[in-house]
Amino acid sequence: VTTIAFDPYSDAQRDDPYPAYAEARRHSPVTKLPNGDYAVARYEDVSYVLRHPELFSSTAMMRAMTNVFGSAEGAAKLTPSELARIAQLMERMPKLGEMMAARNMIASDPPVHGPMRNLVNRGFTPRRMAHLETRVREIARASLAEIERKPEFDIVSDFFVPLPVTVIAELLGVEHERKEDFKHWSDCAVAGATGGAGAMGPVDVVEGFTGLSQYLTEIVEKRRRDPQDDLISTLIRAEEGETALTPLEVVMFVSVLLVAGNETTTNLLGNTLIALMQHPDELARVRRDPDRIPAVVEEGLRYDGPIQFLFRQARQDVELAGVKIPAGAIVLPLLGSANRDDAQFPHADRFDPSRNTQGHLAFGLGIHFCLGASLARLEARIALEELLPRFAAFERVEPHVKYVDSYLVRGPKRLPLRAQTSL
């Protein structure tokens, strides 16, 4: 087994992970990391991991959702006041441990996974997506109307954040007026998956999760008394039997959907706009021909996707690319690396919306293929359709992009622009 330096907390890895991915694909397609995990870099092997839940369990995804302290060493560094604050928060949420252990779709395997996915699928039907198109466009236009009044604006906080937050809030049936809270809670979830990397520490993460859980618990109770035409009510009305969800499971489900429903689209749009600005010929081409926007979105997903990897756990001893992975080991299928594999996508480091992107892994593969993929594609397409004609040109205010403090999620933390409005 080859061990290479792979530090997910390093600025270099966070700001540009692709050179390290390329090195891994060439020299160590399955790499044992310093912490004992195994990173899988090539498209063929990543696909294999995702296609075989009988060998690689998704229950390891709970690690991404609960890795608040990063490690035992990280927890040991907490001050007495921080430990006291966390204990105080835990007292306010006596069922927090039970909630984190509740069934949820992204961290489950067959036979539990299928019925749960079918249940949530009811909120993402083609009919509902078609109905959403008009509403997504209304939200996009309202945000852009505000932006037009500003000489400079942060396209992330002013447009790429509020659009998906508002959409997923309305779909779930929560108050989109609290979108700033939702974004903060999502940021806490992302920070939790980084082990408290960056500016947000473990206390912030626990406070955020506690706030989200308390809010959603109240909403679920309201929907039990007064059902509405929304996804939370659909989950509560689940038919009796194996699929029926407990109140805590509904809260956990909605927490996951709320976070995933806005982080994915926000970062997809941020990364794709950066790629277009770095490739002015492509930007000019899509301005001339808006019908190219769906292809731009797909290439954005492949070229610089919002989720860099997933977590799996080996159910048994398994050999992959000549490397023996022991039962119980955590395995990281690197989606971002697989999508840059020349063996699958020739000249993969080139941003080329004309290429065949079929088979990219930005939304995963197999039974855990992202349930909200159609919604993310819809939001991204409409956002670009409304954004690009409105401004004749963009100019970056800051020369360097600051990315979110996460190795799991990739996207610009902010992207201040100076734009010239189209006449």
What are these language model-derived features?
Residues V1-L423:
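Cytochrome P450
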